[in-house]
């Protein structure tokens, strides 16, 4: 989460979705929320010019920064050369294999000001490494945080929220105004905490099937379940699960999606077209 580019000679790049965080009050509040410790494995995605990085390093923990902008990596190495526990990797976080940065015995705490233009696919990518993650703290567009934390029946509720809440405890911590960044974005941001479950409270029989069901259900979110899921499950089967085929997908909670997914997994013949 980069600092204001004052006296650095680096302009934020629109193609990288860069908005450098410079409000020290916001930075301090983020660090208090994270509460980093000296023995922890901290991984920061998109550090920018290192405003948050610096505060994380002061905790004494190891900090590995994953930065795509090749002009920023030498700036970061120079700025933090006095911290032997700092390392920067020039890579695209959307394609990066985070397994090389953690082990089950030394899980990582993921932190980042995620580029708004790729935040949703990046979150899905990061969730694939959840077994090596202690927790995640992300600055995101407020609308994305609302979707992550949304409950059934809310306008923001959809595929992202259902799947994130299957894997993690999701907490919206606080909002951040545009003025905290340089350049200022046009929208409000928010900090979210994602804490992966050791075991999902509502474990399904097959996650790939759950993913398919949720994706299909919300592909046409204004249509009823009997229409959106007709390739996967019959109306009679939905009724046998005590689920009304006439309701829209945003009315279903995670337990109902898990029930549908388990049924679809157990009855593969119904998937044949």
UniProtKB/Swiss-Prot annotation:
The family database entries (InterPro entries) matched by this protein are listed as: KsgA/Erm (IPR001737), rRNA_Ade_diMease-like_C (IPR023165), rRNA_Ade_Mease_Trfase_CS (IPR020596), rRNA_Ade_methylase_Trfase_N (IPR020598), rRNA_adenine_dimethylase (IPR011530), SAM-dependent_MTases_sf (IPR029063)
As for subcellular location, the record says:
Cytoplasm
Residues at which S-adenosyl-L-methionine binds: 19, 21, 46, 67, 92, 113
Give the EC number(s) listed in the UniProt record.
2.1.1.182
Please give the positions of the paired cysteines in each disulfide bond.
Answer: none
HAMAP family in the cross-refs: 16SrRNA_methyltr_A
Q: Name one GO molecular function term.
A: 16S rRNA (adenine(1518)-N(6)/adenine(1519)-N(6))-dimethyltransferase activity
Q: What is this organism's lineage?
A: Bacteria, Pseudomonadati, Pseudomonadota, Gammaproteobacteria, Oceanospirillales
- GO annotations of cellular component type: cytosol
Reactions catalysed according to its record: adenosine(1518)/adenosine(1519) in 16S rRNA + 4 S-adenosyl-L-methionine = N(6)-dimethyladenosine(1518)/N(6)-dimethyladenosine(1519) in 16S rRNA + 4 S-adenosyl-L-homocysteine + 4 H(+)
SUPFAM superfamilies membership: S-adenosyl-L-methionine-dependent methyltransferases
Gene encoding the protein: rsmA
Q: What is this protein's function? A: Specifically dimethylates two adjacent adenosines (A1518 and A1519) in the loop of a conserved hairpin near the 3'-end of 16S rRNA in the 30S particle. May play a critical role in biogenesis of 30S subunits.
Family indicated by similarity:
Belongs to the class I-like SAM-binding methyltransferase superfamily. rRNA adenine N(6)-methyltransferase family. RsmA subfamily.
UniProt keywords (A-Z) are:
Cytoplasm, Methyltransferase, RNA-binding, rRNA processing, S-adenosyl-L-methionine, Transferase
- PANTHER family named among the record's database cross-references: DIMETHYLADENOSINE TRANSFERASE, DIMETHYLADENOSINE TRANSFERASE-RELATED
Spell out the protein name for this chain: Ribosomal RNA small subunit methyltransferase A
